Amino acid sequence: MEEDDQVLHLPNPMTGFGVPNNPCVSSDEEVVAKVGQADLAELHSDEGCTGHSHGEIRRDVERYGGDEPAPHVKKNVLEEIRKWNLVWAGKNKVASLDPDELEFFLGFPKGHTRGICTTNRYVALGNSFEVDTVAYHLLVLKGRYPNGINVLSLFSGIGGAEVALHRLGILLRNVVSVEKSEASKDILRNWWEQTNQQGNLIEVEDVEKVTVERVEQWMSQFGGFDIVIGGSPCNNLAGGNRDSRDGLAGEQSLLFFDYSRILDLVQSI
């Protein structure tokens, strides 16, 4: 194991995969049913920007008294609501979703992102995928790995893939998590501990450090990876970015090509 690999051997005083008040999904049908909810992968809010929108929307609507606003006003109001993920909180009053509500809608455990500042919580959740949607796509793995799974998780973020696998009742034997954000790493590490995971969590801070030698070392140690999974390498590709989205042409977005590089490595060894 190289020096900057951090292996966390955490105590597991409890039996099973979860904690008493947070059981795993009991059936395949439950996961599929929950996936029918709206796609909330782009939920994100910025308190500094939405304050202005709140006031504008209220003034625009109240200008018409009790009458129906003009079509162009209704269009502008709805655009602002969609843009900033606002909800109606009373007559002519809109409000931002708070981080706890975002966690709920995205399918993360309650308090998943607690412990970091509010702004960072919004950023982390805005760059995340909807957990139950991820679980739906991973459902096929449930019966294939009754003894647990080895995961190479690239651009892990706050652990959406790990949470989804756990929710399906799949034991996480070994997880190599590649993530640069310290805040996101803290969130995943805390979740790993709180859910009493029985396996090993190995943290790597830079995807460019995932070399042939290290992949060979991990595969020799674990007996291979069962799945390589990855999120968006930066907000340039995420729904939370409303300003500059250059796709794979973005400077940091080029890191996405490391995903295919690493996948080829795993398949060739």
Where are the regions that the model predicts?
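Conserved active-site and SAM-binding loop architecture
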Residues: 1-269
